[in-house]
Amino acid sequence: MSEPRFVHLRVHSDYSMIDGLAKTAPLVKKAAALGMPALAITDFTNLCGLVKFYGAGHGAGIKPIVGADFNVQCDLLGDELTHLTVLAANNTGYQNLTLLISKAYQRGYGAAGPIIDRDWLIELNEGLILLSGGRMGDVGRSLLRGNSALVDECVAFYEEHFPDRYFLELIRTGRPDEESYLHAAVELAEARGLPVVATNDVRFIDSSDFDAHEIRVAIHDGFTLDDPKRPRNYSPQQYMRSEEEMCELFADIPEALANTVEIAKRCNVTVRLGEYFLPQFPTGDMSTEDYLVKRAKEGLEERLAFLFPDEEERVKRRPEYDERLETELQVINQMGFPGYFLIVMEFIQWSKDNGVPVGPGRGSGAGSLVAYALKITDLDPLEFDLLFERFLNPERVSMPDFDVDFCMEKRDQVIEHVADMYGRDAVSQIITFGTMAAKAVIRDVGRVLGHPYGFVDRISKLIPPDPGMTLAKAFEAEPQLPEIYEADEEVKALIDMARKLEGVTRNAGKHAGGVVIAPTKITDFAPLYCDEEGKHPVTQFDKSDVEYAGLVKFDFLGLRTLTIINWALEMINKRRAKNGEPPLDIAAIPLDDKKSFDMLQRSETTAVFQLESRGMKDLIKRLQPDCFEDMIALVALFRPGPLQSGMVDNFIDRKHGREEISYPDVQWQHESLKPVLEPTYGIILYQEQVMQIAQVLSGYTLGGADMLRRAMGKKKPEEMAKQRSVFAEGAEKNGINAELAMKIFDLVEKFAGYGFNKSHSAAYALVSYQTLWLKAHYPAEFMAAVMTADMDNTEKVVGLVDECWRMGLKILPPDINSGLYHFHVNDDGEIVYGIGAIKGVGEGPIEAIIEARNKGGYFRELFDLCARTDTKKLNRRVLEKLIMSGAFDRLGPHRAALMNSLGDALKAADQHAKAEAIGQADMFGVLAEEPEQIEQSYASCQPWPEQVVLDGERETLGLYLTGHPINQYLKEIERYVGGVRLKDMHPTERGKVITAAGLVVAARVMVTKRGNRIGICTLDDRSGRLEVMLFTDALDKYQHLLEKDRILIVSGQVSFDDFSGGLKMTAREVMDIDEAREKYARGLAISLTDRQIDDQLLNRLRQSLEPHRSGTIPVHLYYQRADARARLRFGATWRVSPSDRLLNDLRGLIGSEQVELEFD
């Protein structure tokens, strides 16, 4: 093989989020295809792609060179930033490069990105090789300006601190000033004896990628391509040129090429990957192993005392627990992980001691008895047949991984504690990268190309919003996409460009829960990335790379449900304390509570963790779970595999005796499998059962059985053939018929693909059960906590309020005196609406209200509140929202008066504030009036009509709280439905049609598996609810009426709904209230007295009727005086459409009682 003549030493990947385009693997692949012996990736101030690059490079036979590009500042150039490329020659250089990058982020940065001081290079120079940055470096800029003195100073710096390690970089990519700089640099090199080096400043792989690269940069910078102000800093020549191309380009400066190879030879960094480096846990004089044994045995004593209060039973059960604990401890210590368990134990115990709610465990870690003894988990693994080997397998060495759930509100407190304990420079969170996803990349590319918003929006909306959606998947899922792609050249060009950019790294963020704890400084293992203020450090390696680099990851996950449980418990225990009861311990509730399972079997699981979706409620209704094992199964069954395979139907039929229980199949079963499969009625549901079957039938160790489970999941033919043979041999040794063994193996293999981790299912089922139990026993506190958690989502709060009403709970409007930011429960067991859930009222105004209330007591009225609070925080707009929501109902006569008095109250408050300010500075001590002395009087006005009140509630709360819009229609609706309310309805006889009416509170259109569309809407008339189904013909005709908050009159057949336990109607005819009036009303009656009638009233009456004269309903005027009553029928040209607007206008003009519709 001939000696290489050139190596690329300056290349950006897409981790250079400003301008890189290609991912590390394609860059390495291209370099290998070009026959390059080595490659440097020098992303801008980061090593984010290093681990992937290092692995890909060695895999392709290419030497990876570690480096980074920097913005540099120095006193000589003032505020001007220059470029510098830094390569690591050895491991010391790699360490110094890591420190440079980390310091650049930790100092904070602005729009230009992180910056290093040139002086930092003095201390951190060892093991580093510098490329000067070409025309953008400090020497390059000084040369182009002809400032020889500055050139001399710069060169002197590098000669002093980087002898033989500073290279003048030469670039020929056709950009302005490159050649001028190059000639000056070559002359300088000859004059000062400086080495030169050639680079191509690579930004993309092929020259054809230039347009995509320009769009990528324009997306980042916020320009359109045709914007004349857009910076044009790149050229089509910045691709990965071949050795031949570079040699031809620099044929006149051969030493610049030779030096690339020389530098590549000098760069020899070894990155330690695949090892584990745990921090040292403090254990005093004991070894880590002995300390773990001690703490585990002590913990098991406490657990056994709780599990088996009866000493005789405890003595009887102890041996199996002792034996399991001993086995697990041996494996943990032999595998070198005692410190890991102790670290997790410590921060979980700290959390519990400091009021931070912790989950009972999740994932396979719940299968460890040691974890249970150390109180890392809260589920007895022996009781539920959870396997340790599913978590930590001695036959497959890998790091244990506890996923720990914490209360969302307090999780950061735990991270702070860990940082305090192990040192802030040894603890960090983990980076995560956002990429250009399908929907967003279409919008971004469309904007940069200058397409109109509507054009881009039409394409983007065709891409399904599913997580993980790609353009390729979207083309399969949405038939319109390929159609418009083929039909429209502009669409095709946009999508083709979007495909080139899809998946490119766009930005960096913080992983939701990943935390690493290092034995020394984090920067000994990975560089840091910080926010613009230099805070919140995260490792530059993502979650998989950081583990591969040797740091141990701990998952501190935030689970909203734990926050809900915590809030509920705070309210519950406050009430229990008042009643002299001990606090409720949610971990000690019985797992066989009848009230809870009765509620579960009724599918009343709205707001219950994991069990609230419609599909899950359907499954619950069919399964009728009556024990905790059934709840564990629910979590495992409600997944696409089991649902689509028929497993769920088999499970339900076996539970209810409609199918014979066999272990596992009627034809092929073995009695030894009964203990394994009995909890799931003979169905192979869990991964642990796969392992146990292999152990029982074929003598596998549980570690070996875990390997079998993994092999079945991967479905590799050669591995499965090997496992089949091992399974057969083991079964034969156990005296099991060969054919039976192979048939069972086939069944196990089939179901292994659907199998779920029982440890995870059990742990999450426990959280589900806790929320179910709280809902059953403390419904008000639980629902208040759930609504608080969803305060920012008005639509969810509306649904939860609905559930509260269904449960018979009373909800009071928000109240300025008794209300809090959150929903809470008062002493009467009523839920008080959270002020924080009012739209348009932020946290600041509420804090101002509560602060003033705590300081001066309850507010007496509106004027008092305005005088005592900071009206800069509590402005007019906020006060209007509070009035409309009902929060001031107890402070004034009615909402209309409060609203009309608001200006006076604010003016009085302003005057009071000015007077108080003057009074405080008055040398004679003449103070302003106290708030109670302020003269106040409410505006005299009529109360708002009920509909205006309700509309205000709807605007601010998202729902009607103190009334119902249907109230004003009830008398009228009776005419349409024959007086039958929804609560009085019953199934109709076959062929018989009944009419119902109500307010639409929910409406949707769904598509069945056969592709048929069905409309479903829920009617509410305050007496009850009715679900109405509209099948194809009816839906086509009436879909336009299926809108929330519309009053509908529906005729159809009523039947019993097996799912909800209520009634449902199949609609034949649907009308809104306006259509019903047109059909059934015989006239519009207007009653006036002689005292009311005058020319002005008649003129206004005419103005009200005029816009509605296109209808069919005659108008009748009833005139009343003391001695007579007359009826006047308006002419045919005055027939009207009796809409809500007309009726409300007339009632507002002459009074509600004097306007009504007439019927036969």
Swiss-Prot record:
Its main location: cytoplasm. The keyword Cytoplasm applies. GO terms for biological process: DNA replication. InterPro entries: DNA_pol3_alpha_NTPase_dom, DNA_pol3_alpha_thumb_dom, DNA_pol3_finger, DNA_pol_IIIA_C, DnaE2/DnaE/PolC, DNAPol_HHH, NA-bd_OB-fold, NA-bd_OB_tRNA. Keywords: Cytoplasm, DNA replication, DNA-directed DNA polymerase, Nucleotidyltransferase, Transferase. It holds the Pfam family DNA_pol3_alpha. It catalyses: DNA(n) + a 2'-deoxyribonucleoside 5'-triphosphate = DNA(n+1) + diphosphate. Its EC number is 2.7.7.7. GO terms for cellular component: cytoplasm. Disulfide bonds: none annotated. Transmembrane segments: none annotated. One of its GO terms (molecular function) is 3'-5' exonuclease activity. The keyword Nucleotidyltransferase applies. It is found in: Cytoplasm. Gene3D superfamilies: 1.10.150.870, Bacterial DNA polymerase III alpha subunit, thumb domain (1.10.10.1600), Metal-dependent hydrolases (3.20.20.140), Nucleic acid-binding proteins (2.40.50.140). Belongs to the DNA polymerase type-C family. DnaE subfamily. The DNA polymerase holoenzyme is a complex that contains 10 different types of subunits. These subunits are organized into 3 functionally essential subassemblies: the pol III core, the beta sliding clamp processivity factor and the clamp-loading complex. The pol III core (subunits alpha,epsilon and theta) contains the polymerase and the 3'-5' exonuclease proofreading activities. The polymerase is tethered to the template via the sliding clamp processivity factor. DNA polymerase III is a complex, multichain enzyme responsible for most of the replicative synthesis in bacteria. This DNA polymerase also exhibits 3' to 5' exonuclease activity. The alpha chain is the DNA polymerase. This is DNA polymerase III subunit alpha. The gene is dnaE.
